[in-house]
């Protein structure tokens, strides 16, 4: 607080107190949405500035992109710099992740004596569990198909994010 005192030619005095305040510190909150499928580009980031003196401007790197939000992002690290009305700045980085690629390991047991007793099975890793299985030519929805004749069979696997992989056994 500062006091200003003014005295005129007639010795009249006026005093006035003034308080000079500082804005609250600039603060930045970041949130993200990871890429759904390995190698995808559907990640997103959002930034929210508070404190300082609004309005705020946002600049993202890489790409020198303006805006509070970014979408359609690939895996990587993104840095945002927020600038308030008075030119105060604050920077922060956030990393967009992705799941491990879906990996399928297949196996089979051959039919014996021309009887429909063959079996095909699959083990899945990567992606985001749980998984769904589809053997299109067999109308089977699980990780093992049994009662099979000799031949080729295709299985399609989808994870929780609808990422898919297929294999022919």
Where are these regions (language model features)?
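Proline- and Ser/Thr-rich low-complexity, intrinsically disordered segments
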Residues: 1-169
